From Swiss-Prot:
Protein name as annotated: Antigen Lp49
Biotechnology usage: May be useful for detecting a broad spectrum of Leptospira infection in humans and animals due to its presence in several pathogenic serovars of L.interrogans including copenhageni, canicola, hardjo, icterohaemorrhagiae and pomona, and also in L.borgpetersenii hardjo. May be used for serodiagnosis of both early and convalescent phases of leptospirosis infectious disease.
GO biological-process terms attached to the record: positive regulation of plasminogen activation
The keyword Disulfide bond is assigned to this record: yes
Gene Ontology CC terms, in alphabetical order: cell outer membrane
InterPro entries documented for this protein: Host-pathogen_enzymatic-act (IPR051200), Lactonase_7-beta_prop (IPR019405), N2O_reductase_N (IPR011045), WD40/YVTN_repeat-like_dom_sf (IPR015943)
Disulfide feature: 346-347
Highest taxon of the lineage: Bacteria
Organism: Leptospira interrogans serogroup Icterohaemorrhagiae serovar copenhageni (strain Fiocruz L1-130)
Reported function: May be involved in virulence. Binds human plasminogen (PLG) and stimulates its proteolytic cleavage to enzymatically active plasmin in the presence of an urokinase-type PLG activator in vitro. Activated plasmin has proteolytic activity which may help the bacteria to spread throughout the host by degrading extracellular matrix components, facilitating tissue penetration and invasion.
Compartments, as annotated in UniProt: Cell outer membrane
Keyword Oxidoreductase: no
Signal peptide: 1-34
Length: 456
């Protein structure tokens, strides 16, 4: 009854004033806690401390605009490689040394941003914009040894990368960027020519083929230490396949046109098949009774005529070839029973086979020279690396006139979902076991590209 309305009113005003004063402090703390310094590092009111020149690559560079706040940062093209350019750009340096955000835009591509604390972080980087409508996001580029022929995840973040024109294979962690070079003994590594790998986790082994030494090498999957070498009588060893039913490893031999059979325990070649055409990719049937062989051609004397070979494991001979002639390169299982996918390099297509009917169900057109294919662990997508046309006069070991492409095929409908441009001759390709990442190797750029899959 003795309350004073005037005092209450003044007290209420004071409380509201205190709240209003606390709002900026609250926002400041939220920004600091979340790591989002965009409200704190706007270039508008920041004091500059000169500029720093950086050099990095942009894909694509034509039509691309780079902004810092409202300011457009011009760049100078130093080198061009089709749609990719090495550029030079002056970036403002601020006294507060807080993070800055570069925003990139280009017609036909999704807007992108790149955050750095120091300008030198951009040096030697690749910024690749994602095409409009694409659901895969470019994350990073890592340099490798010369000519990364294939890639294989050995866990969720580490890759085994055999090098065709180098002395072994790189094992690279896509989170840290740390690389370890694995090489066999001196007499082997100097011959170069490392091609493909298999990982056998149940026996803690990582195998790699070396075609120019006619050999296969075994490393410890955990420690990466060298363990053994298997010398082969087959010539130019390529694809490796582990048979868990018989505890054997198969290796396709390009020049001798046969397949070496290796005892995994003894690390010895125990036999070879007869000539079976020019073998490339290999796949074992689920019951282990048949071995499917991607014939690049019918023989070394022919430029075409390769089909899908069916080899009987009991009879130890080729019992059938199916499908149209071409240059079959790689085979993977489909997401349903009796379904497999085969890449055909000469015909720019992926063939879908019904193994029960022993025929091609469908052909899916893709870009030139499709080679490695990989089914995502979740079974949703088949990924295809397409090298693109060879150089018109100097073959595939010289950069061609256009860049290669990566295709994504929806396995429910077996239709192309999306595709985008990669580097010079994308060749190796794999998806991480946890479904998060797609990695490809740009064979003639000596690098890999890492993409984040949608939803992961």
């Amino acid at each position: 009854m003795n309350s004073n309305p005037k005092k209450k009113f003044l007290k209420l005003i004071k409380i509201k004033s205190d709240i209003i004063l606390l709002i900026p402090i609250f926002l400041f703390l939220v920004c600091c806690k979340s790591g989002d310094f965009s409200l704190l590092s706007s270039p508008i009111n920041r004091e500059k401390n000169g500029t720093e020149i950086v050099k990095f690559s942009i894909h694509p560079y034509k039509g691309t605009v780079i902004r810092l706040g409202e300011e457009i940062l011009p760049f100078k093209v130093l080198e061009m490689d089709k749609n990719i350019a090495l550029v030079e750009m002056a970036i403002p340096v601020y006294k507060d040394e807080k993070e800055i955000e570069l925003k990139l835009s280009s017609p036909g591509f999704q807007n992108s941003s790149y955050r750095i604390r120091k300008p030198e972080e951009l040096n030697e980087k690749l910024i690749a914009l994602d095409k409009e409508g694409i659901t895969h996001r470019f994350i990073s580029r890592f340099k490798t040894g010369f000519q990364p022929k294939s890639v294989r995840f050995i866990d969720n973040t580490r890759l085994a990368i055999p090098l065709l024109e180098d002395e072994g294979m790189d094992v690279l962690d896509i989170n840290s960027g740390q690389t370890v070079r694995l090489s066999p003994p001196e007499k082997y590594k100097k011959k170069l020519g490392f091609v493909e790998t298999i990982s056998i986790p149940e026996h803690n082994e990582l195998w790699v083929s070396q075609m120019q030494a006619n050999a296969v090498h075994v490393f410890d999957l955990k420690t990466l230490a060298y363990k053994a070498t298997v010398d082969l009588t087959g010539k130019w060893s390529k694809i490796l396949l582990y048979d868990p039913i018989r505890d054997l490893v198969y290796c396709s031999n390009w020049i001798s046109e046969d397949i070496s059979v290796i005892d995994r325990k003894t690390k010895l070649e125990i036999r070879k098949t007869d000539k079976i055409g020019l073998p490339r990719g290999l796949l074992l049937s689920k019951d282990g009774k048949e071995l499917y062989i991607a014939q690049f051609s019918a023989s070394n004397q022919e430029s075409g005529g390769g089909r899908l070979g069916i080899y009987s494991m009991d009879k130890e001979k080729l019992i059938d070839t199916i499908g149209p002639p071409g240059n079959k390169r790689h085979i993977v299982s489909g997401n349903t029973e009796n379904k497999i996918y085969v890449s055909d390099m000469c015909c720019s297509k992926i063939e879908v086979y019904d193994l029960k009917e022993k025929k091609v169900q469908k052909s899916i057109p893709v870009f030139d020279k499709p080679n490695t294919i990989a089914l995502s662990p979740d079974g949703k997508y088949l990924y295809v690396s397409c090298r693109g046309p060879n150089h018109p006069t100097e073959g595939y070991l010289k950069k061609g006139l256009v860049l290669g492409k990566v295709y994504v095929i929806d396995t429910t409908t077996d239709t192309v979902k999306e595709f985008w441009e990669a580097g010079n001759q994308p060749t190796g390709l794999d998806v991480s076991p946890d479904n998060r990442y797609l990695v490809i190797s740009d064979f003639l750029d000596h690098q890999i590209r890492v993409y984040r899959r949608d939803g992961f």
